[in-house]
Amino acid sequence: MSAPKSGGDPLPHPPKEQLPDISYCITSPPPWPEAVLLGFQHYLVMLGTTVLIPSALVPQMGGRNEEKAKLIQTILFVAGLNTLLQTVFGTRLPAVIGASYTFVPVTISIMLSGRFNDVADPVERFKRIIRATQGALIVASTLQIILGFSGLWRNVVRFLSPLSAAPLVGLVGYGLYELGFPGVAKCIEIGLPGLIILILISQYMPHVIKGGKHVFARFAVIFSVAIVWLYAFFLTLGGAYNGVGTDTQRSCRTDRAGLISAAPWIRVPWPFQWGAPLFDAGEAFAMMMASFVALVESTGAFIAVSRYASATMPPPSVISRGVGWQGVAILISGLFGTGIGSSVSVENAGLLALTKIGSRRVVQISAGFMIFFSILGKFGAVFASIPSPIIAALYCLFFAYVGAGGLSLLQFCNLNSFRTLFILGFSIFLGLSIPQYFNEHTAIKGYGPVHTGARWFNDMVNVPFSSKAFVGGCVAYLLDTTLHKKDGSIRKDRGKHWWDRFWTFKNDPRTEEFYALPFNLNKYFPSV
């Protein structure tokens, strides 16, 4: 198409199946020194969730700093294993597989169940609760393993279009807004400078100092965390938080001596380290529903990762394969006793966008750091002592990038269609509104809107409707596949024709380049 004449109508930006301006795509690794630093950066980012979840749950379970340190080490170790499995045998996307907030409500429900009230020793109570979550996770893992490896989830993904994927991927990022600025505000004198410095280094400095363009853009996390961590250290050293409330000290202080002293120098986590798993049918069903919610959210996260890795849309068979290996990740989490299930790390997906480096090798190196620092507990505990508002400042940028990745899929859709506008607007609105009702009800009354005598049934209903990505994605998927589907023009409005070539593995040569299994395994496990 020729360029418009001067004064003519401007041309729209052409849709791009692969995101341009990515420095290193999924198959092109950066030089080793740079790759190692980038891998360490991914490790720093995933530490946030790894530390925050045990820090919130372990004291309520009855555990001490020793148990908290061991649980953090276990989650780190398992995350490293699962990330390697996903990048080598799963989708092969540069996706970090870490602890997921989706499983937290079910873990809390297990913790509050009356069957542990008779345990007097707090540490023994902690171990019993962990063993109960182990049993639930082991059973729940079968859902994703069966749906993924049998190809059943592939049949669901085939009906996905850019229109229905946009709310799903968008809410995977934007739906985590509660972990962003509210976390920054827990210690505003640390969190807000962290956010401002991160934006200055990553967005403005590359344009001001041309020679260091790539350095500032790619290593903004390391620079900003180091600067603000040092600033927080001097505030702590100067006595700024002496005499303040416990919550403020926990959020602001850098001298978490309890965690560092409690961590062993060298410790290798092992399966069933807390004891034999405890199985309960109700808890297993509740955890299975959380697993299904994580499956839907991870499908959106895989699409976001593929976008920022400058890869094409993953074929349904590849996403299904990744879901199967994510089921294996939940199984490993259950065997090792992490107390929480696994899914795709949304914050690390956002880091791909910030650095413009979607290399698979970088994420595999980060998995090596996870395993290394999980074994050397003291060193890992030092990095785990980074104040949470600094991590929340990173989340503000990373979750925004993932949400924007979802909105970018709308370039394939007809935004002048009222059908498109209805599905897009209605699904995003309900994706925010319904979980808001469920979460508000839980915060005010202490239990969800569905409150029967069966705790497991309550969790099976309350957990999915508390997930913004799950609600918004399901509403968009349902409307998009049922509303005037037989109309021929609707297919183009949905953007389906842009993804047709990626719906089977052999249709596009780029698919095999990005997603083929290593060691010629496609010969024995062919994708369709």
UniProtKB/Swiss-Prot annotation:
Signal peptide: none annotated. Residues 1-20 are annotated as: Disordered. The chain crosses the membrane at residues 35-55, 71-91, 93-113, 133-153, 159-179, 181-201, 219-239, 285-305, 367-387, 390-410, 418-438, 460-479. This is Nucleobase-ascorbate transporter 5. InterPro entries: NCS2. Weakly expressed in the vasculature of developing leaves. GO terms for molecular function: transmembrane transporter activity. The keyword Repeat does not apply. Belongs to the nucleobase:cation symporter-2 (NCS2) (TC 2.A.40) family. It holds the Pfam family Xan_ur_permease. Its main location: membrane. PANTHER family: XANTHINE-URACIL / VITAMIN C PERMEASE FAMILY MEMBER.
